[in-house]
Design a protein with these regions (language model features):
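Extended assembly-interface regions of large multimeric machines
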Residues: 1-220
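Mixed-charge (acidic/basic) macromolecular-recognition segments
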Residues: 1-24, 33-36, 227-232, 236-276, ...
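C-terminal domain/tail detector
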Residues: 28, 361-617
Length: 617
């Protein structure tokens, strides 16, 4: 719980007013209480009482976080976790060494480089002692990357007055066998710094792509099944670790508001196998659109990038060892005593201790001491054992957080309690030494990094490619753990048909996930303008035939004014995210379909029916 000074000042003012009243009734105490030059000892006493009563009053008015935290940790634990720093990693394959596709798997650990590099020098200076070797910032690659023996050479806009055309020219490594070149592994990222261009390209790729052809060696290869599939909505595209009991629609909404760049990816699909006789050193992918590209769009060679993937500042770590003592209510979780500012806790994964036991070995005839691992169960889980209230023996661990008074973020503690919240007896703890496995971040250190600082790896990396971060790491975002916001979030999780009848209800749900708006006043104003642009939400039941079977679902029409958005493409991306999220409101064996209407131009975009995910019971 974060200490709020207003409670202290209100209580101190109340005590001073009472002092004046008391001095009026008892004049012999006036020189201690009512006079301006009061006794300093009395003044310190009043301030101390005001501090204690202010804390007590704040605790009474804190909206029962002990209850809401437990519910949210079970229903949606990521809301009480910080959103770590995120960035984009680009690989550059060595064309002289790459002849076949090479996979860079997700979960690859990337760091700020070798000792003495510029990135690590910044971190050592940040730690306060340039002679200390600060631990590097560690990022985890969130998606697979396929490296192919091709490079993107040129992107050209060849639109006509009636149709849009984009030519993407690729250079091929010498000696490449076209028979083994699977171009369906190509993934594009809209990497232009111009938000207008990248959002408009997103709209054109999703809505107006009409066809494509491959041109190489003077011949054109038609591709009737070609499509560009938007990336970021499937479970394998997740950036944040996501529990299995929580629907991915919440993840999509949270990641969109925290890092929209992770959704600007497209997979090339439907490219046929190339003829074996091709021996070209380049080829061109021509994309045809049903309408010309906007006149003010600016296509450059970096408007499309290959071999990119988002990375997140998350890694496995162990906390300092804890010795259990039955007289303590909780224990501080410290990832590192030497570099406390370099680590922050994202989640507690497991709690394990070593227990000793004696047994008599038959061949020796004497007791032998053995050690076994004891895995402590989590309190906020669905694995509680049935016990009588007077004979409780199972001890659970509980991760507790409160807003830190000394730095941004939280202070973390670990408590060992019974199922009813009571403290266990000393015999159940046995002064054991506990090892706590964590998932950690580097707190705010990645903000000090610049593009090109992340170039190292903790394990084996493909020798055929180098890599670097091409965007500056974002600032981590901590959740709000006090106040009425949690009750609003729990209300939003109570999904039902009535939630789709009111635009204000949808705005409240969206606001709960927009963590940038919570921390930054400027982003809050921009977010509020976009929420105000949602004018109407109309939802009606509809019937559709799926494989000849009639199915009833929900159809929602969202009317949005385009003024606060960069362009129509940004509106379309928001609609794509909401299409995945709103499928939560349709029950199993049902569906939901979304239509977004631009209230200024009356243009509309419709998304395909999405199967419902809300259980009936």
């Amino acid at each position: 719980m974060e200490f709020e000074e207003r409670y202290y000042r209100q209580e101190l003012d109340h005590l001073r007013q009472l002092s004046k009243l008391l001095a009026t009734e008892k004049p012999h105490l006036a020189r201690f209480l009512a006079e301006k030059e009061a006794d300093p000892d009395i003044e310190r006493l009043l301030e101390g009482v005001a501090f204690l009563t202010g804390n007590l009053r704040q605790k009474i008015e804190d909206e029962f976080p002990e209850l809401t935290h437990g519910l949210i940790r079970m229903l949606w634990p990521n809301y009480l976790r910080p959103v770590p720093s995120m960035t984009l990693i680009e690989y550059a394959p060595d064309m002289d060494k790459t002849s076949v596709p090479v996979l860079i798997p997700r979960n690859e650990q990337l760091t700020t480089g070798a000792k003495g590099t510029q990135g690590n020098a910044v971190l050592s200076a940040y730690s306060g002692n340039e002679h200390d070797v600060a631990p590097p910032c560690t990022f985890t690659l969130c998606r697979d990357i396929w490296l192919l023996p091709v490079q993107l050479d040129q992107v050209e806009n060849r639109s006509t007055p009636r149709h849009g055309i984009i030519d993407i020219t690729f250079a091929v490594a010498p000696g490449t066998d076209f028979a083994t070149l699977d171009l369906n592994r190509l993934r594009f990222w809209l990497g232009n710094d111009d938000n207008y261009t990248r959002y408009q390209l997103y709209l054109w790729f999703c809505e107006y792509l009409q066809g494509a052809e491959l041109m190489a060696g003077g011949q054109s290869i038609p591709m009737p099944e070609f499509m560009l599939k938007a990336v970021g909505f499937e479970s394998e595209d997740a950036m944040l670790p996501w529990p299995g009991n929580v629907h991915s629609g919440y993840r999509v909404l949270q990641e969109f508001f925290c890092y929209a760049d992770s959704f600007l990816f497209f997979d090339a699909c439907g490219i046929p196998a190339l003829p074996d006789r091709l021996k070209e050193n380049c080829f061109t992918l021509r994309l045809r659109f049903s309408r010309p590209l906007p006149a003010d769009i600016r296509l450059r060679d970096d408007s499309l990038r290959l071999y990119c993937a988002p990375a997140i500042n998350l890694f496995a770590h162990h906390a300092e060892a804890i010795t259990l003592d039955h007289q303590r209510q909780d224990y501080a979780l410290v990832p590192s005593r030497h570099f406390p500012d370099h680590y922050d806790i994202f989640s507690v994964n497991s709690v394990v201790s070593q227990t000793q036991g004696k047994h008599r070995k038959a061949d020796l005839g004497r007791p032998v001491i053995t050690e076994a691992a004891r895995h402590w169960p989590a309190f906020e889980s669905f694995r509680h054992q049935m016990e009588y209230s007077r004979k409780r023996e199972v001890v659970y661990w509980q991760h507790r957080t409160r807003t830190s008074l000394f730095h941004r973020g939280f202070d973390h503690t670990l408590a060992f309690i019974h199922a009813d919240g009571s403290l266990p007896d000393a015999s159940l703890l046995n002064n054991e030494v506990v090892s706590v496995s964590l998932t950690c971040t580097n707190r705010e250190l990645p903000v000090q990094l610049r593009p090109g600082d992340i170039t190292g790896t903790t394990g084996k990396n493909a020798s055929v490619a180098s890599f670097r971060n091409i965007t500056r790491p974002t600032r981590p975002l901590w959740p709000v753990i006090d106040g009425s916001l949690h009750w609003s979030l729990l209300s939003a999780m109570n999904l039902n048909y009535l939630s789709l009848l009111d635009a204000d209800a949808l705005k409240q749900v969206i606001a709960n996930f927009d963590r940038h708006a919570i921390h930054h006043p400027q982003m809050a104003r921009l977010s509020q303008q976009k929420l105000d642009a949602i004018e109407r939400l109309e939802t009606t039941p509809v019937d559709r035939l799926f494989t000849g079977i009639p199915v009833r679902g929900l159809a929602s029409t969202l009317s949005i004014h385009p003024e606060p958005f960069v362009c129509e493409g940004e509106m379309y991306l928001l609609g794509a995210v909401l299409s995945h999220f709103l499928s939560l409101y349709a029950s199993v064996n049902s569906f939901h379909m979304l239509t977004v209407v631009n209230t200024e131009s009356q243009e509309s975009w419709k998304w395909a029916e999405r199967t419902g995910q809300h259980p009936l019971i």
